[in-house]
């Protein structure tokens, strides 16, 4: 345990491995939340970036292996698994997406599997990866968070990528004029041109808030659920370090019970992120909403 107190232990496990410019002007790693905050916008969460890229590569490698080994005869276990995943996502897209785009199904599959893998890291005991980072670095105080989706920077980045696609397809399908009209002529309208002009600011305010709420809610929903789940695992780990036999025994029971329940959470959150992406992009392909 890198920190001596329970509060210090919790804070240590909730801090990212942050690299940026220190107050003295040099570049290095932050060893406290205050140092990380002082680094400002151009601070890099290397643990989030590293795990996100690594899990993305694992996803690509697994599916590439399945594609190369695919046969029309008796499929293997990996091919069966990939086919089930593809059929599941393809069915979800057909049920929820009402436009035509060859990008949506691959995007939905990528989002579901990638988010699921990032969430699944939360099932690894909370001390294992941070302790490995300490052994490799030789620094007993270095923080390291392995669950990328407990970092709001990661979830917001994914959500705003989806938001960029929403804007792109809205303009592509409806035209720039149609997109602007969608923001300014709805939900209130009038046959009187003068009244309609007066309603434009009201419509724009309502539609803009609705539009910008999509990526924010998408990101914060995933972050909030995964952060809460990670915090519960950390609190259970504190029980093991309490020194009380009965509390440690309770921690064992809670650890397994929460891990089993958390399997549902990590799968459900990946599914929700994927489905909302499909729905938002379907709305972008529709002429009216």
Swiss-Prot record:
Gene3D superfamilies registered for this protein in UniProt: ATP synthase, F0 complex, subunit A
| Principal location | membrane
Q: How does it sit in the membrane?
A: Multi-pass membrane protein
Membrane-crossing residue ranges in chain numbering? 43-63, 104-124, 160-180, 193-213, 232-252, 259-279
- Any one GO CC term of the record: plasma membrane
Q: Which CDD domains match?
A: ATP-synt_Fo_a_6
Q: Where in the cell is it found?
A: Cell inner membrane
Transport in keyword set: yes
Q: What do we know about how this protein assembles, alone or with others?
A: F-type ATPases have 2 components, CF(1) - the catalytic core - and CF(0) - the membrane proton channel. CF(1) has five subunits: alpha(3), beta(3), gamma(1), delta(1), epsilon(1). CF(0) has three main subunits: a(1), b(2) and c(9-12). The alpha and beta chains form an alternating ring which encloses part of the gamma chain. CF(1) is attached to CF(0) by a central stalk formed by the gamma and epsilon chains, while a peripheral stalk is formed by the delta and b chains.
Task: Describe the function of this protein.
Answer: Key component of the proton channel; it plays a direct role in the translocation of protons across the membrane.
Q: Which family does it belong to?
A: Belongs to the ATPase A chain family.
- Protein's UniProt name: ATP synthase subunit a
Q: Which organism is it from?
A: Pseudomonas putida (strain ATCC 47054 / DSM 6125 / CFBP 8728 / NCIMB 11950 / KT2440)
Q: What is the lineage of its organism?
A: Bacteria, Pseudomonadati, Pseudomonadota, Gammaproteobacteria, Pseudomonadales
Gene encoding this chain?
Answer: atpB
């Amino acid at each position: 345990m890198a920190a001596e107190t329970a509060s210090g232990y919790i804070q240590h496990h909730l801090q990212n491995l942050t690299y940026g410019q220190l107050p003295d002007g040099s570049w290095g790693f932050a060893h406290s939340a205050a140092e990380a905050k002082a680094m400002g916008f151009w601070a890099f969460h290397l643990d989030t970036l590293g795990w996100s890229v690594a899990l993305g590569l694992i996803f690509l490698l697994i599916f590439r292996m399945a594609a190369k080994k695919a046969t029309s005869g008796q499929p293997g276990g990996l091919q069966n698994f990939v086919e089930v995943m593809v059929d599941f996502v393809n069915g979800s897209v057909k049920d929820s997406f009402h436009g035509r785009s060859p990008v949506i199904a691959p995007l939905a599959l990528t989002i579901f599997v990638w988010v699921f893998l990032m969430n699944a890291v939360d099932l690894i005991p909370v001390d294992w990866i941070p302790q490995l980072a300490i052994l490799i670095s030789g620094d007993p105080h270095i923080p390291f968070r392995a669950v990328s989706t407990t970092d709001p920077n990661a979830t917001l980045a994914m959500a705003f990528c989806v938001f960029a696609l929403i804007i792109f397809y809205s303009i592509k399908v409806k035209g720039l004029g149609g997109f602007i009209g969608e923001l300014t002529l709805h939900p209130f309208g009038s046959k009187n041109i003068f009244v309609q002009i007066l309603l434009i600011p009201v419509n724009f305010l309502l539609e803009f808030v609705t539009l910008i709420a999509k990526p924010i809610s998408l990101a914060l929903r995933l972050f909030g659920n995964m952060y809460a789940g990670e915090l519960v695992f950390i609190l259970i780990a504190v029980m093991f370090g309490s020194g009380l036999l009965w509390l440690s025994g309770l921690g064992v029971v809670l650890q397994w019970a929460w891990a089993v329940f958390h399997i549902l959470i990590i799968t459900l959150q990946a599914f929700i992120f994927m489905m909302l992406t499909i729905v938002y992009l379907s709305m972008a392909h529709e002429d009216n909403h």
